[in-house]
A protein has these predicted regions:
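A eukaryote-biased sequence property
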Residues: 48, 56, 62-306
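Extended amphipathic alpha-helical scaffold segments
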Residues: 2-77
Length: 306
């Protein structure tokens, strides 16, 4: 895979947070373009944007809808099992259309201008694929690849997400990467001070492209995992709030108490609730509300031993 996280951020600019949100919420994403190798490369590269999920490749890891449905059923009954992200490559497009009807969590390659198992893939085919995917999906993303360096992304239907979390992740990546690279360059420059080194050698020593890629990857994975772990703590807490309500309690949790309890301070509450719904198949929207609730904060504290 040649499309690193840093490269995707640079190429997509302001569209990257929307793409990241789409993948985190497990909406299907269609990757369409006229270079089959690049389309497949990007399709596989996008799976790295969800480092907490286990990648499955259609026709390599499974070949039928019943198999992937069983994976999803296991997710619903076991919070601890690895969540999945599915990759459908160009050569198996027709098979995917014939065998699959639910594409949540899929990234699907559509090689325009190529023939796949006897089917000529055209813009009309792309429309048919999009319509097929939308039959059982609330929304769908379309990533168009015009050239190796020209990529655009949009949703078929508007999104309600604030994208606050995704924008903060990108901002943290850029800031922390810049700070780390500046520290490294300062140390390297200091170590070479006083030496008779040509500008060519100095430039080569201070060129940190590989380190920049690695730093971006590391910071990105750290920030995504921080969000996932905070959301997982929210699931633990909210499932107990729900149990208390089922036992007759009339309490719900405030947004402030929830965020304090799980150690999270970013993003809008509806975005967190939607991510939990996508990741753990649970809807806790009735368990959290704005405003103060007497005594609940202490009860939440007691759950965590504070």
């Amino acid at each position: 895979m040649t499309y690193s996280i840093m490269k995707l951020i640079e190429l997509m600019g302001d569209q990257f947070p929307l793409l990241l949100n789409t993948l985190l919420e497990r909406m299907p994403v269609i990757v369409a373009g006229e270079d089959i190798e690049i389309v497949d490369d990007i399709t596989e590269s996008l799976t790295t944007l969800c480092p907490h999920r286990h990648k499955l490749v259609f026709w390599r890891d499974f070949t039928s809808e019943s198999e992937i449905v069983s994976v999803w059923e296991e997710e619903k009954h076991n919070y601890e099992v690895s969540r999945t992200i599915v990759c459908g490559l160009s050569g198996n497009l027709r098979l995917a259309m014939d065998r699959i009807s639910h594409f949540a969590g899929w990234i699907l390659a559509v090689p325009l201008g190529f023939t796949v198992l006897g089917v000529q893939v055209t813009e009309s085919t792309l429309q048919d694929v999009t319509a097929h995917v939308l039959k059982n999906s609330g929304n769908c993303g379309l990533l168009r690849v015009s050239s190796p360096s020209a990529i655009t992304f949009s949703l078929v239907r508007p999104s309600d997400s604030s994208l606050d979390v995704e924008k903060k992740i990108v901002n943290k990546i850029l800031v922390r990467k810049k700070q780390s690279l500046e520290r490294i360059r300062r140390l390297l420059t200091k170590s070479l001070r006083g030496l008779d080194v040509s500008n060519h050698i100095l430039t080569a020593v201070l060129k940190l492209d590989d380190e920049s890629e690695k730093l971006t990857q590391d910071v990105f994975e750290e920030e995504i995992n921080n969000y996932v772990h905070a959301a997982r703590r929210a699931v633990t807490l909210l499932s107990r709030i729900r149990l208390a309500r089922e036992l007759g309690a009339s309490t719900t949790l405030t947004e402030r108490n929830l965020y304090e309890a799980i150690g999270w301070d970013g993003g809008e509450l509806p975005d967190l609730i939607q991510f939990i719904r996508a990741e753990w198949h649970e809807d806790f929207s009735d368990c959290v509300k704005s405003g103060a609730l007497s005594g609940l904060g202490a009860w939440v504290d007691s759950m965590w031993g504070t």
